Design a protein with these regions (language model features):
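Short glycine/proline-enriched turn or capping motifs at secondary-structure junctions
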Residues: 3, 860-863
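Flexible, membrane-facing loop/turn or short amphipathic-helix motifs
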Residues: 839-840
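Bacterial Sec-dependent N-terminal signal peptides
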Residues: 1-23
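Glycoside hydrolase catalytic-domain context in secreted enzymes
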Residues: 20-836, 845-861, 870
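Short, structured beta-strand-loop surface elements
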Residues: 866
């Protein structure tokens, strides 16, 4: 009888929470994500739990758990997942000093992401691929402490406060009002900002406590405590001898215990491998110990496959299953919050037509406009001519430079795929009358020669370029699945479930690309192919001349062909792939050697030269195989403009031309000689798909520039401390004692502004019984002849703190003023405004004492006004 009673009790308990409709608690959408996660967790075996702890989360079919892909990217729009709206690169968004606009950009990104996720689930029966999930590993809120860092373009600049405000805006836009539209991720935690070439071995062990709390951690804290970010990514490097993904101090003591973070922590991709790999961190003897160390320290999810050894770590007593349960609970709770486990969500009603729609692209255009920084706009040296900008479209204008007609440069890195891109040359074309525009590339960004594509010179089926014929079989058989025409180099891939063309499979397909070329003079052609697939074959007049197989990343020509004058050549590329992801990057062209003297002759009639230079994401970025003068592994070794451009600009100046220099880069470039040779200068960063239109609007006066530098532009590399030194002394505007070329916060306008004397408005008792915050009220007047935006900036200085920052940004506000209009700008003065490092507690806190409130249009001392205050 006792046995029957016990059995009955067990049955009753097991069904106590079973809804009437027969669903198990974790399947009941009316229950909270916490309750559902706890219920599902108790039903999983250890092996099933571990299968959920890697970025390619495994299904548990007996419980209805679908596979899930945690890794997704949205640095400046949905990335790696087909066509989407592309915004300016993150550093360009920071230059807007407009956190409301940035939030709008990422609200758009999360809207498009929800649609893409729904379409992917419907098409794949819930078996989505990488880059189709709802968890986005952005924003990057590392501090851009050194302009040599190639990934600095992914950040929001060198200032902790600006980075915090932009990062909070990104998280709010991605996560939405309910916090679960998509999930954002604050990365890379912590003390991480290059170099790229040693990030798997580097140990940040020379960081002063005040640098940690005043510089490296504030943005992460803001995203956790204010924006309630759902994920945090731990970095590759070591901090104080421990890999960041194995640092209990960072992940448990600070992140969870002090800041109250209750989301999940993911590793950077394959970072756990660095724990046990000889020659890298090698802090653990093997995978098993590395896995246990990472999870014990607080890394819930691994991007990679090392965690597969966790069951053995449990068996050896290196970690408990209870500790693994804590991590798996967080993962399950996040998936329930997103509705990823449910048959439908409210976001499923968003129509597919919103993807890359015109309204979204207009926001991208506005972000590009607001992020353009006017560095210089001076009258001629003799004073006889007015400032060069805005340009007169009736003039004869020569457009020169390696970035003028480069669409890919505009995209930055970690980019999506726009439906169209407007290059800077395209934008200028739209303003200048026919016959008044001269275009010459003139130089490469960094190399002595340049590769010029000739994909458009041939014809096939009566159309220019290359004709493509696709088959949904790997052997070119069966009906034609799709056709297409290409006049630019092929950049085709299936990453993120992006088909080569509509109607073409993602796997097991083939393609034929064909054209016929004929030249008036002898012409050598170079063919390049980077591929991932079964094979790529090049045919000339029906004969196969070269075959590549598997994965090929070599950028050297696969084949050279000398075409005789007047003779037609039938060219064909055949590409085939089986299962798995694939890529086909193909180009046909020739290497160009530049002739500066010939260029000067061709632009002799130009009234003005617009030189579009700088560098590109092909030279700076994440752990890149780049080896050229001034660059190393994605980073830079010299911050000057590359020599080939510097010399050409000097020659154009010597020829007597007035020059507008447009600098495209994700980092600060020293422009000392260029400032002497050029009458006007713009910094446009990597301005996104419509960046060319925004630049042209600015050049011709339809957009009044209002961007501000989120970085310092140094005079030369000699002004920088060692790249490997993470101490802030001498770095950025906050600690720099020398005078830079252009200061943080700098940006000119086509109008002028005047700042009146500010006053402090004290806190008052409100009708609801609460106290208003104390405010600094600053009168600002547009003293010019046209409307424009001004970015009002407040810096705080603690004169009695000789070891702290010289000054540090604590508030800003973008305003629009009509000619003659005055507005009173109110900036909050709260505890955070006066938060300073306290040497006694080792933490940030509002300290008593003397402060200087410095307000004005930039961080330059000569434009700032001051109010002295004393805090009790």
């Amino acid at each position: 009888m006792k046995k029957i009673t016990a059995t009955l009790l067990t049955l009753l308990l097991s069904t106590a929470f079973l809804p009437a409709q027969g669903l198990l608690p974790y399947q009941d959408t009316s229950l909270s994500p916490t309750r559902r996660a706890n219920d599902l967790l108790r039903r999983l075996t250890l092996e099933e739990k571990v299968g959920l702890m890697m970025d390619q989360s495994q299904p548990v079919e007996r419980l209805g758990i679908k596979p899930y892909q945690w890794w997704n990217e949205a640095l400046h729009g949905v990335a790696r997942n087909g066509v989407a709206t592309m915004f300016p690169q993150a550093i360009g968004l920071a230059a807007t000093f407009d956190d409301e606009l940035v939030e709008q950009c990422f609200d758009i990104a999360s809207t498009e992401a929800r649609v893409k996720n729904r379409l992917a689930r419907e098409k794949s029966n819930d078996n989505i691929r990488r880059y189709q999930g709802l968890t986005f590993w952005t924003p990057n809120v590392n501090i851009f402490r050194d302009p040599r860092w190639g990934r600095g373009q992914e950040t929001y600049g060198e200032d902790p406060y600006l980075t915090s405000r932009m990062g909070v805006a990104v998280v709010k836009g991605l996560q939405g009002p309910d916090g679960n539209k998509t999930h954002a991720c604050a990365k890379h935690y912590a003390v991480h900002s290059g170099p790229e070439w040693n990030r798997h071995v580097f140990n940040a062990d020379n960081v002063a406590p005040r640098d940690l709390w005043e510089t490296y951690l504030p943005a992460f804290k803001a995203l956790v405590t204010e924006a309630h970010v759902k994920e945090v990514m731990c970095a590759y490097n070591r901090y104080e001898n421990e890999p960041c993904c194995g640092s209990s101090r960072l992940l448990t003591q600070i992140l969870r215990n002090e800041w109250g973070f209750d989301g999940l922590v993911t590793s950077d991709c394959w970072a756990i491998n660095d724990f046990y790999t000889p020659g890298l961190h090698h802090t653990e003897p093997d995978t098993i110990h590395a896995d246990a160390k990472a999870v014990w320290s607080g890394t819930d999810l691994e991007c990679g496959g090392s965690y597969i050894a966790l069951p053995e770590a449990v068996n050896l007593g290196l970690i408990t299953e209870d500790r693994i349960d804590q991590s798996v609970f967080r993962l399950l709770k996040a998936r329930f919050e997103l509705g990823e486990m449910d048959p439908s969500t409210p976001y499923d009603t968003i129509p597919a037509s919103v993807i890359a729609c015109e309204a979204h692209k207009l926001v991208s255009l506005q972000a590009a406009r607001e992020g353009i920084v006017l560095l210089k706009n001076a009258p001629s040296a003799d004073g006889r001519k007015a400032p060069l900008l805005p340009l007169n479209p009736k003039q004869t204008i020569a457009v020169v430079g390696p970035n003028a007609n480069d669409s890919v440069m505009l995209w930055g890195n970690y980019n999506g795929t726009p439906d169209r891109t407007v290059t800077i040359l395209d934008g200028i074309h739209s303003y200048v009358k026919p016959g008044k525009l001269i275009y010459e590339q003139g130089s490469d960004c960094a190399f002595e020669t340049s590769y010029s594509s000739l994909m458009a010179v041939g014809k096939h089926n009566g159309k220019p370029g290359w004709s493509a014929t696709y088959f949904n079989t790997p052997d070119f058989s069966g009906p034609v699945a799709a056709t297409a025409q290409y006049t630019t180099n092929l950049r085709l891939y299936t990453f993120g479930a992006t088909a080569f063309a509509a109607g073409v499979n993602l796997e097991n397909f083939s393609a034929q690309f064909a054209t016929t070329v004929q030249f008036e003079k002898d012409q050598e052609l170079e063919f390049t192919l980077q591929m991932l697939g079964t094979f790529g074959q090049l045919y000339v007049n029906g004969e196969m001349v070269k075959e590549l197989k598997g994965r090929v990343g070599d950028k050297e020509p696969m084949y050279r062909l000398l075409c005789k004058a007047g003779k037609p050549y039938e060219l064909e590329l055949r590409f085939s792939t089986g299962s798995g992801q694939c890529a086909c990057m193909f180009d046909m062209g020739h290497t160009t050697t530049f002739d500066d003297d010939a260029l000067l002759r061709r632009i002799a009639k130009a009234d003005v030269v617009v030189f579009v230079g700088g560098i590109s994401p092909r030279l700076e970025g994440e752990e890149m195989p780049v080896s050229v003068e001034g660059f190393k592994g994605g980073d830079r070794t010299d911050i000057q403009l590359p020599r080939v451009q510097r010399e050409l600009i000097a020659k154009i100046h010597k020829a007597g031309k007035r020059i507008v220099y447009v600098n495209c880069s994700g980092s600060a470039i020293s422009l000392v000689p260029e400032a002497e040779h050029c009458d006007a200068m713009l910094q446009v960063f990597y301005p996104g798909q419509l960046g060319g239109q925004a630049v042209a609007e600015t050049l011709f006066g339809d957009n009044n520039p209002s961007g501000r530098l989120p970085i310092t532009i140094y005079k030369d590399t000699l002004q920088l401390p060692s790249f490997l030194d993470y101490r802030m002394k001498g770095r950025t505007y906050r600690y720099m004692e020398q005078k830079p070329q252009f200061c943080f916060g700098h940006g000119l306008s086509y109008t002028t502004f005047a700042y009146g004397d500010a006053h402090i408005e004290p806190a008052t008792l409100l009708e609801d019984g609460t106290m208003s915050e104390e405010r600094l009220v600053i009168p600002v007047t547009n003293t010019g002849l046209r409307a424009g935006d001004e970015v009002v900036q407040l810096y705080v200085q603690r004169p009695d703190d000789k070891e702290g920052p010289v000054k540090t940004l604590r508030a800003f506000r973008r305003i629009n003023l009509l000619p003659g209009e005055t507005k009173e700008v109110e900036l909050p003065l709260d505890d955070d405004t006066f938060a300073w490092f306290d040497t006694h507690t080792g933490r940030m806190m509002s300290l008593s004492g003397r402060y200087n409130l410095l307000y004005g249009p930039s961080s330059a001392d000569d434009v700032l006004k001051c109010i002295e205050v004393t805090r009790p």
